[in-house]
Amino acid sequence: MLQENFVSCSKEREVQLAVLSEFIHIPTFIYTALNLVILYFILKRLLFKPVWEFMENRKNSIAESMEKAEKGKAEALELKNKYESELNEAYAKAQKILKEAEEKAKQEYERIIRDAKNEAEALKLKAKEEIEREKNEALKEIRNEVVSLALEAASKVLEANMDTEENRKLVNRFIDEQGVA
């Protein structure tokens, strides 16, 4: 039985080989394989290599673009930070200038008020002095008038030969004693 199986297997195998040999023609198979190998090298040289180089170049180009974009982003961020700090500095400087201007205006206001008060005080003092001077002049004129009137009255009453200078002294002494002026 084993032999029978073996014989039947070998017959089947022969049949399969015969069928296969009908489909496969060895020289055609060799030419086809050789053509495929040649086609592979031609395609590798003419198509795969340029495509591979194109893909590598594209990959490198994309990597460079990404790197440039990252650099540009970093530079933009740096510029943004720089401009923000400059803007903050300018704002602080403007605030400082405004504060200084406000302080100067306040000091100027206080100086003007102080000067106005001093000038008003000086004018008051000058007016008081002027009033005092005019009062003294008026009193002096009144005194002279009173002296003249008193002399006239005394000369009419006395009708003596007294000298005018002595009369004046006498009247002045009388007025001083009375407290007029």
UniProtKB/Swiss-Prot annotation:
Q: Which Gene3D superfamilies match?
A: 6.10.250.1580
Q: Where in the cell is it found?
A: Cell membrane
The record gives the membrane topology as: Single-pass membrane protein
Parts of the chain that traverse the membrane: 23-43
Single GO MF annotation: proton-transporting ATP synthase activity, rotational mechanism
UniProt keyword annotations, A-Z: ATP synthesis, Cell membrane, CF(0), Hydrogen ion transport, Ion transport, Membrane, Transmembrane, Transmembrane helix, Transport
> Could you tell me which InterPro entries the record lists for this protein?
ATP_synth_B-like_membr_sf, ATP_synth_b/b'su_bac/chlpt, ATP_synth_F0_bsu_bac, ATP_synthase_B_chain
**Disulfides per UniProt:** none
Gene Ontology terms: cellular component: plasma membrane; proton-transporting ATP synthase complex
Pfam family example for this protein? ATP-synt_B
Complexes and interactors:
F-type ATPases have 2 components, F(1) - the catalytic core - and F(0) - the membrane proton channel. F(1) has five subunits: alpha(3), beta(3), gamma(1), delta(1), epsilon(1). F(0) has three main subunits: a(1), b(2) and c(10-14). The alpha and beta chains form an alternating ring which encloses part of the gamma chain. F(1) is attached to F(0) by a central stalk formed by the gamma and epsilon chains, while a peripheral stalk is formed by the delta and b chains.
Family from the record:
Belongs to the ATPase B chain family.
Functional summary from the UniProt entry: F(1)F(0) ATP synthase produces ATP from ADP in the presence of a proton or sodium gradient. F-type ATPases consist of two structural domains, F(1) containing the extramembraneous catalytic core and F(0) containing the membrane proton channel, linked together by a central stalk and a peripheral stalk. During catalysis, ATP synthesis in the catalytic domain of F(1) is coupled via a rotary mechanism of the central stalk subunits to proton translocation. Component of the F(0) channel, it forms part of the peripheral stalk, linking F(1) to F(0).
Recorded protein name is ATP synthase subunit b
